[in-house]
């Protein structure tokens, strides 16, 4: 049996880039909670002792940007300079303007258009992917890397590993074989965890705790064997972290946000963007389409692409590839997808209920992945029934 190795990585909510994603989405949540028609393009950057939010926002909402920044940093665990940032003392810079009136009239017709007439907020192409290798219909390498990161945060916050600090990265290499286009995981080849820690803990303690409290609960035993390689804080020391260690910026972790290097990516980031931005809503609907193809048994693995022109409601193209795993030809599946899903931006917002704020909905997406999560707020993970006829054997 010929196998190959594939690797996916993840970063924790305390990673500077992810801190920025969460601030941008917390701002979006605050705007949508008061005004579902808010137009938001919010970027965040951070470095030692400073967080800046900037961009274009048009909203009726009354938003205290500085409070949102501080609350978000605090909830992640940035409560002193020692851990990389002090939410209460850091500088917060705000430079937010209204959306360009040129874009507003071209895309939204200044709110005069019916939903089905609303044009895409920008050009671009987005991909959705699904695979039958996990219950989430997501790639195993990505699922494990993401869950290890989420577990690191859990044991930091519940006190099981009190020496942990907010910043951290994970990476998992999985050995696969290709079953006529479908991906079948055989074993976990390598687990890498680099986590920020306090001064008091030894490398041996770190390794023992990570194995016991993080790796064991996350990686199913059947994937681990005596040959599995563990790199646990391989650089030795990681005390300085968060924005003190590295600068951070919204939209710099787009592969972690999606499929861990599987499938494809159109390049557009998600966080800080309202649903009229097809970078986000387009990527969400094609995930729903790809997931529905696999969940309905039409294929074991699928990728769906959609593309847009600014100001134009109808997509320019929709593409489906099932990597040779389709039960019926891809062109038939494409026809079913186009009949089932409405790819017009105004309709995607309605069908996926994307304008609903509150519940920290989009901030939840901004750490540990936008896809494969079991949460009712992740409406794009709901499988739609697809009508198709099985070809008799």
From Swiss-Prot:
It is found in: Cytoplasm. Mg(2+) binds at residue 9. Binds 2 divalent ions per subunit. The metal ions interact primarily with the substrate. Can utilize magnesium, manganese or cobalt (in vitro). Binds 1 potassium ion per subunit. The potassium ion interacts primarily with the substrate. Gene3D superfamilies: 3.30.300.10. L-methionine binds at residues 56, 99, 246, 277. Coiled coil: none annotated. Pfam families: S-AdoMet_synt_C, S-AdoMet_synt_M, S-AdoMet_synt_N. GO terms for molecular function: ATP binding; metal ion binding; methionine adenosyltransferase activity. Its cofactor is Mn(2+); Mg(2+); Co(2+); K(+). Pathway: Amino-acid biosynthesis; S-adenosyl-L-methionine biosynthesis; S-adenosyl-L-methionine from L-methionine: step 1/1. It catalyses: L-methionine + ATP + H2O = S-adenosyl-L-methionine + phosphate + diphosphate. Catalyzes the formation of S-adenosylmethionine from methionine and ATP. The reaction comprises two steps that are both catalyzed by the same enzyme: formation of S-adenosylmethionine (AdoMet) and triphosphate, and subsequent hydrolysis of the triphosphate. May be involved in the synthesis of betain in response to abiotic stress such as high salinity. Homotetramer. This is S-adenosylmethionine synthase 2. It comes from Beta vulgaris.
């Amino acid at each position: 049996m010929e196998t190959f190795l594939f690797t996916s990585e993840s970063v924790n909510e305390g990673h500077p880039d992810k801190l920025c994603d969460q601030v941008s989405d917390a701002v979006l949540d605050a705007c949508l909670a008061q005004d579902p028609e808010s137009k938001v393009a919010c970027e965040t950057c951070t470095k030692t002792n400073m967080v800046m939010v900037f961009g274009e926002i048009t909203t009726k909402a009354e938003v205290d940007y500085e409070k949102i920044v501080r609350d978000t940093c605090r909830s992640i665990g940035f409560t002193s300079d020692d851990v990389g940032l002090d939410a209460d003392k850091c500088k917060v810079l705000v430079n937010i303007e209204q959306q360009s009136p040129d874009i507003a009239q071209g895309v939204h017709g200044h709110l005069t258009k019916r939903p089905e007439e609303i044009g895409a907020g920008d050009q671009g192409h987005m991909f959705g992917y699904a695979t039958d290798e996990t219950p989430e219909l997501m790639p195993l390498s990505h699922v494990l890397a993401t869950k290890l990161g989420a577990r690191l945060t859990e044991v930091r916050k519940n006190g099981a590993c009190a020496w942990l600090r907010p910043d951290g990265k994970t990476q998992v290499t999985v050995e696969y074989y290709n079953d006529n286009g479908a991906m079948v995981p055989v074993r976990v080849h390598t687990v890498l965890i680099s986590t920020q820690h306090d001064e008091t803990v030894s490398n041996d303690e770190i390794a023992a705790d990570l194995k016991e409290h993080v790796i064991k609960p996350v990686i199913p035993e059947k994937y681990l064997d005596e040959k599995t390689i563990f790199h646990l804080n391989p650089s030795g020391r990681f005390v300085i972290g968060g924005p003190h260690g590295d600068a951070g910026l919204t939209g710099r972790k787009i592969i972690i946000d999606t499929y861990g290097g599987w499938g494809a990516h159109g390049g557009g980031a998600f966080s800080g963007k309202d649903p009229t931005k097809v970078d986000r809503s387009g990527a969400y609907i094609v995930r729903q389409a790809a997931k529905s193809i696999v969940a309905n048994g039409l294929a074991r693995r699928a990728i769906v692409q959609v593309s847009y022109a600014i100001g134009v409601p109808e997509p320019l193209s929709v593409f489906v590839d099932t990597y040779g795993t389709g039960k019926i030809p891809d062109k038939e599946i494409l026809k079913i997808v186009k009949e089932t899903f409405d790819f017009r931006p105004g309709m995607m917002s309605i069908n996926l209920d994307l304008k609903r704020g509150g519940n920290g909905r989009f901030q939840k997406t901004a750490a540990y992945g936008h896809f494969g999560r079991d949460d009712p707020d992740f409406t794009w993970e709901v499988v739609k029934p697809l009508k198709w006829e099985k070809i008799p054997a």
